[in-house]
A protein has these predicted regions:
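A solvent-exposed interaction/effector surface
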Residues: 1-170
Length: 170
C-alpha cells in the first residue's frame, strides 16, 4: 500500500453513490502494460509517462483501449513502488510488443472497491481509510492494489482526478 505522500492534502469528499468497501468481482481482461518502478515523490509523473507510451504503442498498432487506464501495484515500501501501468484491450495486438511493453492478464476475482476523488498527492488519506476499513472488517488484502482511473490521468487536472481503488481480498 502506498505510504504517505510528501505533502499531505485532503482528498475531495466522496459523493453520493461512491463506493467505499463495495464487494465486486474483477473480470478477466487482457491488458497491454509496462512494468516499472518509481519513487513516491515522482509517482504520478512516472505513471502518466507510462500511459503515454502505452497509448503511442496502441495507436501504432491501430488498437483502441477497451477501458480506463489501470495501475497494478505489485510491491511497495517507504522509498517507492513497483508497478504495471496498463491499458485493457479487447484482444492482444497482432504484432507482439517489444522492449518494455508486454501483453498479459489483469488481476481478476473477488475485490473491494473504494473511490478516491482529488489530487494524486492526497491518495495516502484514501489508502489509510482503506487500511482502517480492512482492519475493522477483519479482511486480509492480497499483496497488490489496483487503481483504475475513471478520469484520464494524462488529460485531467490533478485536483479533478477520480480513481477507483480495487483491493483483492484473500
Amino acid at each position: 500500500m502506498p505510504p504517505p505522500a510528501a505533502k499531505p492534502t485532503a482528498p475531495s469528499p466522496l459523493q453520493p453513490g461512491d463506493a467505499f468497501g463495495e464487494a465486486i468481482t474483477l473480470p478477466e481482461r487482457t491488458i497491454v502494460y509496462i512494468k516499472g518502478y518509481s519513487k513516491w515523490d515522482s509517482a504520478f509523473d512516472t505513471l502518466v509517462d507510462a500511459f503515454k507510451s502505452l497509448r503511442e504503442y496502441l495507436d501504432k498498432q491501430d488498437v483502441k483501449p477497451a477501458g480506463p487506464a489501470i495501475t497494478i501495484y505489485t510491491q511497495t515500501d517507504d522509498a517507492g513502488f513497483s508497478f504495471q501501468a496498463a491499458l485493457p484491450v479487447a484482444q492482444a495486438p497482432k504484432d507482439p510488443p517489444k522492449g518494455d511493453i508486454a501483453v498479459g492478464q489483469a488481476p481478476s476475482g473477488r475485490a473491494l472497491k473504494f473511490v478516491h476523488r482529488g489530487s494524486y498527492d492526497a491518495m495516502d488519506s484514501t489508502y489509510e481509510a482503506i487500511t482502517n476499513y480492512l482492519d475493522d472488517k477483519q479482511l486480509e488484502a492480497k499483496d497488490l492494489f489496483i487503481e483504475e482511473y475513471a478520469t484520464d490521468p494524462v488529460n485531467t487536472a490533478p485536483d479533478k482526478l477520480v480513481v477507483n481503488v480495487f483491493v483483492p481480498v484473500k
